UniProtKB/Swiss-Prot annotation:
The keyword Transmembrane helix applies. Essential cell division protein. May link together the upstream cell division proteins, which are predominantly cytoplasmic, with the downstream cell division proteins, which are predominantly periplasmic. It is found in: Cell inner membrane. Residues 25-117 are periplasmic. It comes from Stenotrophomonas maltophilia (strain K279a). GO terms for biological process: FtsZ-dependent cytokinesis. Its main location: membrane. This is Cell division protein FtsB. The gene is ftsB. GO terms for cellular component: cell division site; cell septum; plasma membrane. The chain crosses the membrane at residues 7-24.
Length: 117
């Protein structure tokens, strides 16, 4: 009977020690959850960077193999045109704003000379 109590005490102490390490020791559950969140954030960042790399790789391939990408770049970034081609630039008019009264000037009824009878 005495051995049984001794064994129960050892098992309870072992369980207590394991629980302490699980909750407060190195690699505890809070730290594991924090690291899992960091891994998820890093995977999301990596996915975005992979998409950007794929787009850049496709652009490099297009520039190496096709003339249309080079022509498009020359037109849009350098403003180049083909010989004999006419270039038209459409400039939209700036919106007209109504004149605002000067600061400190009050525009009340009766202040204007036309308002006086």
């Amino acid at each position: 009977m005495r051995d049984w109590r001794w064994m129960l005490l050892v098992l309870a102490l072992l369980l207590g020690w394991l629980q302490y390490r699980f909750w407060f020791g190195p690699g505890n559950s809070g730290e594991v959850m924090m690291l899992e969140a960091q891994v998820a954030n890093q995977e999301r960042d990596n996915e975005g960077l992979q998409q950007r790399n794929d787009a850049l790789a496709a652009e490099v391939k297009d520039l190496k193999e096709g003339q249309s990408a080079i022509e498009e770049r020359a037109r849009s970034e350098l403003g180049m045109i083909k010989p004999g081609e006419k270039f038209y630039r459409v400039v939209e008019d700036a919106p007209v704003h109504p004149a605002q009264p000067a600061a400190g000037v009050s525009a009340q009824v009766g202040d204007h000379p036309a308002d006086v009878p």
